Amino acid sequence: MLDVKLLRNNFDEVKQKLQNRGEDLGEFEKFGELDKRRRTLIVETEALKSQRNEVSQEIAKLKREKQDADAKIEEMRVVGDRIKTLDIELREIDEKLDMILMSIPNIPHESTPVGESEDDNVEIRKWGEVREFDFEPKAHWDLGTDLDILDFENAAKVTGSRFVFYKKLGARLERALINFMMDLHSNEHGYEEMLPPYMVNRASMTGTGQLPKFEEDAFLIEAEDYFLIPTAEVPVTNYHREDILKAEDLPRKYTAFSACFRSEAGSAGRDTRGLIRQHQFNKVELVQFVKPEDSYAALEKLTGNAEEVLRRLELPYRVLSMCTADLGFTAAKKYDLEVWIPSYNSYREISSCSNFESFQARRANIRFRREPGSKPEYVHTLNGSGLALGRTVAAILENYQDADGSVRIPKVLQGYMGGIEKIELPK
């Protein structure tokens, strides 16, 4: 949520930045109109209240002097009725303004590239060499099926499309990746480990920006009015909802493993095969709470923490700075990490690392005090995937495959898999 004062005092500047996002400005313009009406009503209400006080004093004086006060009493009644009417309108406008404010996205940071589509995202760097195969490489869904480690068919029978069973060494590979990532982030990168709830309430989904605008993308348990989490970012960020943190306790850095649940509304026909776009997938998340002046340096470090996973797995990747049109609702600046997937002959997103500045903190009321007794300020929140597990498995299967249909295990994972070096075709 944006600062209301920023909207009121810098309306045209904010409007331009939202235009750079490609946003429909209808709601934003409505905010300006309603806020103007609100200020007019406040001025009128204050004037009427002042008038009511004056009339009340005049009535008291007339009564003390034994004079007729009926006309003044009627005047005060009319003024009082008008104040009640204006107060009702003010409450209605405040409710509308709150709803609109919740629907306005974050404004891009000045370093975010201005663009009209994903084609305008800017490549920052690449790492690793894309492998040249001397045989026809298989897609990960075929590799997983042939190796008997991924079962999409029975998952579709048990649940539906966009689900998978991990089996045998496939399940062990995923578990190895989880442990490797959590160990790396907690032991070397300084994150505190968490295992969060997989269901959250509406206040939590609102705090991180999924609600009210993107409810159709979420899975709702109607009987309880709980949502299955789309990412561990939601429960972990809301862990500090309504908190006032101490400055000396910042930054707070958390890493959390969780299952994630997404309806993928609007994704019909896209990535229908394999692990790239599932309704349920596992992910290791990175979340930080920092002082405002530290957030952009923190974003670079957080992005580097996610990159380190790919480097140790020796998977080729690139980093993109996302343009204004591809920034997402909550971010002021965002980097995407894309890993090379041979079956797509392209890089595919495996992590997003974002600085939300105070956008989420305002919605969730997460603040800190610089000194005891000082006025609380909003923290800046950041998060990143460190990494998405399904896409990491897909990248390993495809990049580490051999001509005989087997898949080598990255060296960094072999210790987590009991020394197993290769997944071979069943005999």
Swiss-Prot record:
PROSITE patterns: AA_TRNA_LIGASE_II
GO terms under cellular component: cytoplasm
Reactions catalysed: tRNA(Ser) + L-serine + ATP = L-seryl-tRNA(Ser) + AMP + diphosphate + H(+); tRNA(Sec) + L-serine + ATP = L-seryl-tRNA(Sec) + AMP + diphosphate + H(+)
Domain of life assignment: Bacteria
Binding residues annotated for ATP, in chain numbering: 262-264, 349-352
A GO term, aspect molecular function: catalytic activity, acting on a protein
Pathway(s) this gene product operates in, as recorded in its UniProt entry: Aminoacyl-tRNA biosynthesis; selenocysteinyl-tRNA(Sec) biosynthesis; L-seryl-tRNA(Sec) from L-serine and tRNA(Sec): step 1/1
Enzyme Commission designation: 6.1.1.11
Primary location class: cytoplasm
Binding residues for L-serine: 231-233, 285, 385
Compartments where found: Cytoplasm
Protein keywords: Aminoacyl-tRNA synthetase, ATP-binding, Cytoplasm, Ligase, Nucleotide-binding, Protein biosynthesis
Subunit structure: Homodimer. The tRNA molecule binds across the dimer.
Family note: Belongs to the class-II aminoacyl-tRNA synthetase family. Type-1 seryl-tRNA synthetase subfamily.
Role this protein plays: Catalyzes the attachment of serine to tRNA(Ser). Is also able to aminoacylate tRNA(Sec) with serine, to form the misacylated tRNA L-seryl-tRNA(Sec), which will be further converted into selenocysteinyl-tRNA(Sec).
Protein name: Serine--tRNA ligase
Protein source organism: Listeria monocytogenes serotype 4a (strain HCC23)
